[in-house]
């Protein structure tokens, strides 16, 4: 209402693709200029400098950016001082064959699709949204102000019991073929699931012949968002192919992109611009933008779904942003739910989140051993051993020889391999907790154990050792120079929007 009345007027500080640092510098007072002006001027030239630099120079430029970031974020502001690790996504000159051309790998993907199928189901929170729409506008009703409806949902109190119950049902849900068969609406995406798959074998020939293993590292979505983050890097041909695939999957030529570039972080803008934008309050305009205010929200009683439409018919919605859907706030979270109404939590990946869902409570003060879980050649869980931290800390002696002997005894007692990934479990996991990434450790290497000793947090409650797959000699990727490196494939599974389709 404030926007519509003109009482609040959005002011876009800079436009997408524009260098923000000169504009930021122009807003500084003389005192601020003396303090920050030199840094902002250097940042303004950074993009051009990186583009012209060779590898070592580019790394040094990024390291200088790291040091600047560490000065900007003091201790305590975001939980801990940033680690200073920056990376850049780069295209590779080396060409790769499509792994799905190999029949054994394609069979792995088929098996995974069959396992995950009943776990990719319409969410209960989407059902609640439909129920509340019908209570306001009736079965088959039409809402002429979709933004107002979504904002009404967003302003529900924190203690909304129905919302909490629906969210809990989604988190705890198991396989449900009936809910997997429910439609997601004309505006929504097809059912989808992305999987990070890692090949493991002593040689590429062995793997192509059906030997070795395929590890399911993690799940994500498969609506095109992970590919969209690279569309500016890979060019217009890639962008057009991806946009065409999205329209085909949605089953309509008109798919609008929810471009939440102002939400949470400035990195959101990286993936924007693949499809015509849905016009939202505070977002930059575009010539092909379709304002949300020009659309109607409609209930389809035959499918118990909602969709957006105008006089020309229904329109699809796609959210391709970097910020995960569950972290979006306000009305955006409900608008994105309309575009992606699926719950996707199959327990067939070796990711931190998937492992945590297996626990009914806190980790016990005893050793937990979990066997490797397999389905054919697929590894859906690596073998792991979780110890109370108090049992591991005394083994990490200042004398490296003593540490090596202690670790050798531990390995023999529990059958732990030499190469492992190590997780540390902290007693308190607040909003800024980011210790999900494991550390590779060679338990027979003094240097590796010394690094582990310095890495483990004194406050850690438990330490997990997870078998390293792939281990040395089992990585099937190749660098541009032909050196072995780790390879990981992102495979997208989509089920057609018509009922009964296979992935």
Description of each model-found segment:
Residues 3-268, 433-438, 445, 451-503:
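Type-3 copper protein
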Residues 218-473, 478-480, 487-501:
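C-terminal structured domains
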């Amino acid at each position: 209402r404030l926007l519509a009345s003109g009482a609040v007027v959005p002011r876009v500080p800079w436009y997408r693709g524009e260098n923000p640092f000169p504009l930021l510098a122009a807003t500084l007072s003389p005192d601020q200029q003396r303090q920050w002006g030199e840094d902002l001027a250097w940042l303004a030239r950074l993009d051009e400098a990186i583009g012209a630099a060779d590898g070592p120079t580019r790394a040094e430029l990024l390291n200088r950016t790291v040091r600047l970031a560490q000065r900007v974020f003091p201790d305590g502001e975001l939980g801990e001082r940033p680690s200073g690790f920056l990376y850049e996504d780069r295209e590779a000159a080396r060409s790769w064959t499509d792994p799905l051309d190999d029949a054994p790998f394609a069979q792995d993907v088929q098996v995974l699709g069959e396992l995950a199928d009943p776990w990719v189901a319409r969410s209960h929170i989407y059902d609640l949204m439909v129920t509340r729409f019908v209570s306001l506008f009736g079965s088959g009703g039409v809402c002429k102000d979709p933004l107002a409806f979504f904002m009404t949902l967003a302003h529900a109190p924190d203690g909304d019991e129905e919302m909490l119950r629906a969210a809990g049902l989604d988190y705890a849900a198991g396989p449900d073929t009936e809910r997997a068969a429910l439609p997601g609406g004309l505006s929504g995406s097809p059912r989808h699931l992305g999987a990070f798959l890692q090949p493991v074998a002593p040689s590429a020939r062995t793997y192509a012949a059906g030997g070795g293993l395929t590890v399911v590292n993690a799940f994500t979505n498969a609506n095109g968002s992970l590919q969209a983050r690279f569309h500016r890097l890979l060019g217009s041909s890639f962008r057009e192919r991806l946009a065409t695939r999205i329209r085909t999957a949605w089953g309509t030529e008109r798919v609008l992109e929810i471009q939440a570039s102002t939400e949470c972080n400035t990195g959101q803008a990286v993936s924007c611009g693949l499809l015509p934008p849905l016009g939202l309050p505070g977002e930059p305009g575009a010539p092909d933008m379709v304002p949300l205010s020009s659309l109607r929200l409609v209930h389809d009683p035959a499918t118990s779904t909602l969709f957006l439409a105008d006089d020309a018919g229904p329109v699809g919605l796609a959210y391709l942003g970097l910020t995960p859907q569950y972290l979006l706030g306000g009305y955006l979270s409900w608008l994105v739910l309309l575009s992606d109404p699926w719950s996707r939590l199959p327990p067939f990946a070796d990711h931190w989140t998937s492992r945590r869902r297996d626990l009914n409570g806190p980790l016990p003060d005893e050793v937990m051993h979990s066997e490797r879980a397999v389905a054919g050649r697929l590894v859906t869980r690596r073998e792991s051993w979780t110890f109370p931290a108090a049992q591991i800390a005394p083994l990490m002696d200042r004398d490296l020889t003593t540490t090596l002997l202690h670790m050798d005894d531990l390995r023999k007692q529990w059958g732990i391999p030499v190469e492992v990934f190590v997780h540390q479990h902290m007693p308190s996991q607040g909003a800024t907790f980011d210790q999900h990434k494991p550390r590779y450790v060679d338990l027979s290497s003094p240097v590796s154990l010394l690094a582990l000793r310095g890495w483990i947090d004194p406050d850690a409650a438990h330490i997990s050792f997870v078998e390293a797959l792939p281990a040395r000699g089992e990585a099937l990727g190749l660098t541009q120079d032909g050196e072995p490196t780790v390879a990981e494939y992102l495979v997208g599974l989509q089920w057609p929007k018509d009922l009964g389709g296979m992935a």
